[in-house]
Amino acid sequence: MNDIRNTAVPADVKQPEGLPAEDEFFGRMNDPTAAASIKGVCGDEMEFYLVIRDDRIEQVRYHTNGCANTSSCGRAVARRARGRNVTDALSISAGEIIRSGECEPAAGRHCAILAVTTLYRAIADYLLAP
């Protein structure tokens, strides 16, 4: 996996179609404390960027090239993760995201799993850092 933590954000990055313009969590982040990127079985890619201080997630952003449902799941996960202790954020589940009504339950199962798994990997990036 490439280290996406040190990748500059291109100026022409646009939000995916169908994503609300007011999504404060969408976009890449320069110099995060931790980051992760995963490509799902459907071909959608999800990235999470975290700024962590004293084991608390102070800032979180996600980026995806996926469908509106993938974006909705990324937003739902990011909103739940912000402000939480890193170990507490590991309790966010795909089932919780699906039950929240923030994504299409039938089509969104794999989207929710992709979003949550990417968050988990970003947290692991933080916890396992030297």
How would you name each of these model-derived features?
Residues 2-35, 58, 84-130:
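C-terminal binding/interaction regions
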Residues 37-41:
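Short Gly/Pro-enriched turn/cap motifs at secondary-structure boundaries
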Residues 44-54:
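Short beta-strand elements
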Residues 54-63:
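Short, well-ordered strand-loop elements centered on a beta-strand within folded domains, enriched
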Residues 64-73:
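Short, thiol/selenol-centered motifs that function as redox-active sites or metal-ligating centers
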Residues 72-88:
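Iron-sulfur (Fe-S) cluster-binding segments and ferredoxin-like electron-carrier domains
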